[in-house]
Amino acid sequence: MFKKDNRYVTRGVNEEVDIRLQLIMWSMIDKLKDEGNVELDYLQVFRIRKEGKKIVISQSQEVPEYSCTYEIEIEDVQIDDKIKVYVIDSGEYSIMLFTGEY
């Protein structure tokens, strides 16, 4: 699950989410998978918001229940509102998309 090849991003995410944040989300999934402490669910949910000069990224899944939050200092990323992104693994490929694109 969540192999490093065959990863896709929808046009909407690619246009609205900074590439650095996209790479951070993929890295968060890879880290969770590599550590092996938690079984990965096929659906990973990311919530992104800006707090001052920090970007806050919360990752969660339902089965088994898991969540963590990272704070990253990136000043030149513009986030006007909260962003919710799904990353879904189909077994053959993984795709990053907005909830409205599901």
Give names to the regions the model predicted.
Residues V63-Y102:
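Short, compact, well-ordered microdomains
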Residues M1-E75:
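N-terminal "domain-start" segment
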